């Protein structure tokens, strides 16, 4: 789904006379999309890829380079932010917040360069709502309507994309009186919505971005090296966060092994190997179907299959070999990270 916003951002940057784009990527889907969009419009693209994913997913790096992008493992020696992080911890595996800091720092130093973000911000959520709009059209054609929607949630772009168009219907009383349950599914190792604090925080580790009110684990939160790299972000989109704060959407956190169980089950049933991020939504959908089986309810379940896992097979290799582990981020560590939230008076 990432090209939905990458192409739009590249187009408008080109119209503004920008020559270069810097950006971050976790698992690499966003970096690939921005590299492709930059190639389409003749923009140079530099991608700071979270180090743990840089090692886990080498072929996404190859894709970005095929489309002409430069790719660096973050934290890197290219920026002061990266150098400081490496000085503090030479084995730092990186985070999306840290990669964002590096990309923003570089963009701020050059007049011909802008920074592009692949999630979190309002315009990204807007571009992604084409997903939910298309779903609504397809349900109208099928003569059906979902009872519940599941989508993975890190920064929030894929969840916003499928859920926001249905939020409008719910606010108006539902489609023919039918309200849709909207569920964001996040990793238990990075539980921004389910365990974070609703507060003003920076979107990056170094505090370069404007403050945003969101559910956050703290901008210097360093998540473990789970294989759903696209969900390793300390906060959730301000719009997603506001909806959750107001009780208009729900959120659940699921452990890593359960998501891979769901991904393999889906591959057996559908012949599609999902991305680790997508497995979170699939886990939610399967669990809902099993609940319906127990209660005898009939529900129409919609979930967002955000991508395939063809470049994530090393992660599946580790799962099949029994080498993956679950990790619930300790409450004490979350509380410690939240102590560093900015004081906004």
Which positions does each model-derived feature cover?
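Active-site/ligand-binding loops adjacent to catalytic centers
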Residues: 79, 85-123, 131, 142-143, ...
């Amino acid at each position: 789904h990432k090209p939905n916003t990458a192409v739009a951002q590249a187009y408008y940057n080109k119209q503004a006379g920008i020559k270069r784009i810097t950006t971050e990527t976790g698992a690499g889907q966003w970096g690939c999309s921005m590299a492709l969009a930059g190639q389409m419009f003749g923009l140079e693209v530099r991608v700071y890829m979270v180090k743990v994913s840089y090692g886990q997913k080498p072929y996404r790096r190859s894709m970005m380079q095929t489309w002409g992008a430069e790719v660096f493992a973050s934290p890197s020696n290219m920026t002061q932010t990266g150098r400081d992080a490496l000085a503090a911890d030479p084995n730092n595996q990186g985070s999306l917040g840290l990669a964002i800091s590096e990309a923003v720092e570089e963009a701020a130093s050059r007049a011909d360069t802008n920074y592009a973000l692949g999630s979190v911000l309002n315009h990204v959520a807007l571009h992604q709502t084409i997903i939910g709009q298309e779903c609504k059209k397809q349900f109208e054609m099928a003569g059906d309507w979902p009872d519940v929607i599941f989508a993975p949630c890190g920064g929030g772009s894929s969840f916003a994309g499928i859920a926001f168009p249905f939020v409008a219907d719910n606010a108006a009383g539902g489609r023919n009186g039918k309200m849709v349950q909207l569920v964001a599914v996040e990793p238990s190792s990075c539980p921004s919505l389910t365990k974070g604090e609703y507060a003003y925080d920076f979107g990056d580790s170094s505090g370069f971005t404007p403050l945003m009110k969101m559910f956050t684990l703290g901008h210097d939160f360093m998540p473990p090296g789970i294989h759903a790299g696209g969900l390793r972000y300390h906060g959730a989109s301000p719009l997603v966060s506001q909806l959750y704060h107001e009780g208009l959407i729900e959120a659940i956190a699921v452990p890593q092994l359960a998501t891979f169980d769901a991904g393999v089950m889906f591959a057996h049933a559908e012949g599609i190997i999902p991305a680790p991020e997508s497995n979170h939504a699939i886990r939610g959908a399967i669990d809902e179907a099993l609940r319906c089986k127990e209660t005898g309810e009939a529900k129409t379940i919609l979930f967002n299959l955000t991508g395939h896992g063809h470049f994530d097979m090393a992660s599946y290799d580790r799962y099949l070999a029994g080498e993956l582990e679950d990790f619930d981020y300790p409450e004490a560590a979350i509380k410690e990270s939240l102590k560093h939230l900015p004081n906004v008076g």
